[in-house]
């Protein structure tokens, strides 16, 4: 089994991105699966162009995209990506689409094809906080998740794909009072065991409570 893991470069006012720093430290084999990582630009459309090129080159069985969600307290596998860009800030090339469909011929939304609840359980068993997220936002993270699942729908039907947000690294919150952070070591370990779950749960997810009341 081959798994492609992606990590965004820094964006906004941040000098580092924990997603990229973490994926760089992943071992080349996890739970018997071959793992490769690729850096993704935090740029609408260019991000998915880089992803598709790497999919064509590597031919992975699964794609796990990783992104920073500053303020979140744990690792959060995303349930769904929506067909809408609505950028609060410009991307790294100054693009700021507002209320713009990502793909005219795509679905209104795509659900992750990764075992998100098994991933959450695996992370929590390591003593790390994790929960299913029901919104990937409307910035480049949601854009890339949507594009990955669009590619599954239109071009790579045997591939699985999904997205997981991670918190800030501790050094990013030194001057951000009351903002959660996590050590890079713990972030890497959380991603590793999430990948273990992706390998173990190829056909169906665990049936565990992961919903919200609001």
Swiss-Prot record:
InterPro entries: Peptidase_C15 (IPR000816), Peptidase_C15-like (IPR016125), Peptidase_C15-like_sf (IPR036440), PGP-I_bact-type (IPR029762), PGPEP1_Cys_AS (IPR033694), PGPEP1_Glu_AS (IPR033693)
EC number(s) stated in the UniProt entry for this protein: 3.4.19.3
Reaction catalysed by this enzyme: Release of an N-terminal pyroglutamyl group from a polypeptide, the second amino acid generally not being Pro
UniProt record similarity statement: Belongs to the peptidase C15 family.
Functional description taken from the UniProt entry: Removes 5-oxoproline from various penultimate amino acid residues except L-proline.
Organism this protein belongs to: Streptococcus pneumoniae (strain 70585)
Subunit structure and binding partners: Homotetramer.
Superkingdom in the source lineage: Bacteria
Protein name (record): Pyrrolidone-carboxylate peptidase
GO terms of molecular function: pyroglutamyl-peptidase activity
Cellular component GO terms held in the UniProt record: cytosol
Record key words, sorted: Cytoplasm, Hydrolase, Protease, Thiol protease
One of the Pfam families matching this protein, by short name: Peptidase_C15
């Amino acid at each position: 089994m081959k798994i492609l893991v992606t990590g965004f470069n820094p964006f906004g006012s941040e000098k580092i991105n924990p997603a990229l720093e973490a994926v760089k430290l992943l071992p080349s084999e996890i739970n018997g699966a071959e793992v490769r990582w690729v850096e993704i630009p935090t740029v609408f459309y260019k991000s998915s162009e880089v992803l598709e090129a790497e999919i064509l080159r590597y031919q992975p069985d699964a794609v796990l995209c990783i992104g920073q969600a500053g303020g979140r307290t744990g690792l959060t596998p995303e349930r769904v990506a929506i067909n809408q860009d609505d950028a609060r800030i410009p991307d790294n090339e100054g693009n700021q689409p507002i209320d713009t469909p990502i793909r005219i011929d795509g679905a209104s939304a795509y659900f992750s094809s990764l075992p998100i609840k098994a991933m959450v359980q695996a992370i929590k068993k390591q003593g790390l906080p994790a929960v299913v997220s029901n919104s990937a936002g409307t910035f480049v993270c949601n854009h890339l998740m949507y594009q990955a699942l669009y590619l599954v729908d239109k071009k790579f039907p045997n591939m699985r794909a999904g997205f997981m947000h991670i918190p800030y690294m501790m050094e990013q919150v030194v001057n951000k009072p009351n903002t959660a952070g996590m050590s890079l070591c713990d972030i890497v370990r959380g991603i590793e065991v999430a990948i273990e779950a992706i390998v173990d749960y190829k056909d169906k997810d665990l049936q565990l409570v992961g919903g919200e009341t609001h």
